[in-house]
A protein has these predicted regions:
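Nucleotide-activated sugar donor-binding and catalytic core shared by glycosyltransferases
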Residues: 52-408
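An anion-binding loop in the catalytic cleft
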Residues: 1-53
Length: 408
């Protein structure tokens, strides 16, 4: 088990890194708030006639594919920004609810692509491959003026190779984690994209060294989240008194993640509730399916009386109101860091997936705050270390540390 208590000043250290990262984004990002949109509007290749016979600038048709909630969250503001600059643009492909609200026509349910790991993927491979074949057929039959693959590299890169070979300009938004594992994918990326849009500054160097056109555009969360989070406002919104200890539980957005984490998080909450009088738990979930999974876990683990509120979305409000966050590794760890919330990062996958993936890792940590700082500033309890007892102790320690600091 990794140390569950951070060394003195750990959270402050993370805060400094987050502040420095915000400044770096402001300095290096293309001019204007929507730098990504400007890059896309500028194009990757010489301007050409639209597939529909008109001028690309007049009415471009842009295809996009996002494969999970984090991609939906990142791509929706991009669509909004592009529509402001190109009012007649149309957007098609695969996207989630935010992208659809922003004006995209989604041809397939995004949730179908939201799988992670070998064991989970095996069950879904036939359906995912069928969708990719049909999507490629539709896009090649009626070529868009631009294709933007949003994360989801296992789905998008293969599709992008086919589209680029057919002369369709391709941009990939959100770099695959080449720096963490499967670095050999850089060769596939080189065949697949005209330009990579990187969220983090260290990723830009990787692509420049490989001769792949790249732009560091920053992470949209750094614009979205206020530099000084409003804890009191978040608590008022949740109708929680200032003195109540609150823990936000974020078990993930995929159904596969809930299969691994729902029971674990419920058992952890039960242990914490037995040690921290008056504690409240907030659980933001992204879909009815994941909400049902979590509620079923409450019943299975006899935890219906837990002081727990399930929210539909509102993850940032839940984390903003919390004293400590228990979070599955992913984009939510970056949100918690930008909100300056102490957190414990955890993750579980099926045992086969773990044994196949873990030996191929390049870094000793998985959480974005630790990757960005280059050291363990946030505790990670993964796989066999991710037990209810270990997680509960880490959360209780983090709560006690917070209250001690506030009294000093």
């Amino acid at each position: 088990m990794r140390d569950a208590v951070l060394p003195g000043g750990g959270w402050w250290h993370l805060g400094l890194h987050c502040r420095a990262w915000r400044v770096a984004q402001q300095r290096k990002r293309p001019a204007g708030r929507h730098g990504v949109a400007q890059i896309l509007r500028g194009g990757c290749r010489p301007q050409r006639a639209s597939a529909t016979g008109g001028n690309v600038e007049a009415a471009p048709r842009i295809a996009m594919v996002a494969g999970e909630t984090s991609g939906d969250m990142i791509a929706a503001p991009l669509i909004t920004a592009l529509r402001k600059r190109l009012p007649r643009a149309s957007f098609v492909g695969i996207g989630g609810p935010r992208m659809q609200v922003a004006g995209m026509e989604s041809w397939y349910p995004m949730e179908t692509l939201a799988v992670r790991g070998y064991a989970e993927a095996v069950r879904s491979v036939p359906q995912i491959l069928a969708i990719r074949r049909e999507l490629a057929r539709r896009l090649l039959a009626s070529p868009p003026d631009l294709f933007v693959g949003v994360d989801a590299p296992d789905f998008n890169l293969g599709l992008e190779v086919r589209l680029r070979r057919a002369g369709i300009p391709v941009v990939h938004y959100v770099s695959p984690s080449l720096w963490a594992w499967r670095g050999e994918r850089i060769h596939l990326v080189k065949r697949a994209v005209d330009k990579m849009l990187a969220l983090f500054p260290f990723e830009q160097r990787i692509y420049e060294q490989a001769g792949i056109p790249v732009a560091y555009v920053g992470h949209p969360l750094a614009d979205e989240i206020e530099p000084v989070p409003d804890r009191e406002g978040a608590r008022e919104q949740m109708r929680i008194k200032p003195e109540v200890p609150v823990i936000a539980l974020l078990p993930g957005s995929r159904r596969g993640e809930l299969e691994q984490h729902a029971g674990l998080f419920v058992e952890t909450a039960k242990l914490v509730a037995g040690q921290v009088p008056g504690v409240r738990f907030l659980v933001p979930l992204t879909s009815r399916a994941t909400r049902l999974q979590f509620e079923e876990a409450q019943y299975r683990h006899d935890a219906r009386d837990l002081p727990l509120t399930i929210l539909f979305g509102h993850a940032q409000v839940a984390m903003g109101a919390a004293d400590v966050v228990l979070v599955a590794s992913g984009t939510a760890t970056l949100e918690a860091a930008l909100l300056r919330r102490p957190m414990v990062i955890t993750y579980r996958v099926p045992r086969l997936t773990w044994h196949l993936m873990w030996p191929r890792r390049r870094l000793p940590y998985v959480g974005l705050p630790n990757i960005l700082t280059g050291e363990f500033v946030v505790p990670e309890l993964l796989q066999d270390d991710a037990t209810p007892a270990n997680l509960a102790q880490a959360l209780v320690n983090a709560l006690r540390d917070k209250f001690v600091r506030e009294r000093q």
